[in-house]
């Protein structure tokens, strides 16, 4: 990230640790333990890796996160430049409570994490690039499986079969996904791909507006400095607070 000038990094290292049995039971998937956004006294986010799914009814192994290639993708998503960096930037940058807490929305948070996987992909080994695409396939499947289940257009067993046969998830993870869509967090899983598409479209719009003046590092620094604005407000902030000043500066230089 530093060598490719993708985004500014915190000075401290990211924290990655194994989950406790209680954490694995509460959330049996890799995740970021989010630091306090109000009254933070130096805490940072922690990338937590579960070692098992204690709630799994099947004895089948959940092997979706325990192979080497996926570690690159998980680190980009949960740690840097994904969740951990985004929350560190808000805390260290002094983002307002309104933007950091009250504006919280999954389209921003999960969209940024999935976008982070995409911007890191060109610099990863081939097997890790394939893992990035596999993870993106899962998020794109969520975008239609979740609403189809909740609208009664698809049965849980049909969705589970699709996840196992087409997306190639393990049986325990496929079941966990179905529970997520229909019980624990209906609608939330769609935010990953929706937010990702919004960020990709915003980047394309920004690059077209700036041409040779576009710089990934300053652009990404600006994005995370905005806190957790929803996509429409984030686009407005980028166009007015990032693109226009650069265009004005370029016009001033050419005018001189």
Q: Where are each of the predicted segments found?
A:
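Long, His/Glu/Asp-enriched segments that create or flank divalent metal/ion-associated functional microenvironments
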Residues: 1-256
């Amino acid at each position: 990230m530093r060598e490719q000038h993708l985004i500014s990094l915190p000075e401290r290292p990211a924290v990655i640790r194994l989950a406790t049995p209680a954490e694995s039971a509460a959330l049996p998937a890799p995740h970021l333990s989010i630091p306090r956004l109000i009254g933070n006294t130096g805490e940072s986010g922690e990338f937590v890796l579960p070692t098992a799914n204690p709630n799994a009814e099947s004895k089948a192994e959940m092997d979706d996160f325990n192979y080497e290639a996926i570690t690159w993708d998980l680190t980009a998503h949960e740690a840097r430049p994904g969740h951990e960096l985004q929350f560190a930037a808000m805390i260290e940058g002094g983002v307002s409570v309104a933007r950091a807490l009250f504006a919280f929305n999954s389209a921003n948070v999960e969209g940024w994490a999935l976008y982070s996987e995409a911007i890191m992909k060109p610099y990863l080994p081939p097997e890790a690039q394939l893992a990035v695409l596999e993870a993106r396939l899962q998020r794109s499947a969520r975008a239609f499986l979740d609403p189809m289940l909740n609208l009664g257009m698809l049965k849980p067993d049909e969705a589970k079969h699709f996840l196992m046969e087409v997306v190639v998830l393990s049986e325990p993870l496929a079941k966990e996904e179905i529970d997520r869509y229909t019980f624990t967090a209906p609608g939330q899983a769609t935010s990953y791909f929706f937010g990702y598409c919004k960020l990709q479209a915003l980047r394309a719009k920004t690059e077209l507006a700036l041409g040779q003046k576009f710089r990934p590092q300053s652009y990404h620094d600006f994005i995370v400095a905005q806190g957790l604005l929803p996509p429409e407000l984030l686009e407005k902030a980028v166009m007015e607070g990032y693109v226009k000043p650069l265009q004005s500066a370029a016009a001033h230089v050419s005018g001189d």
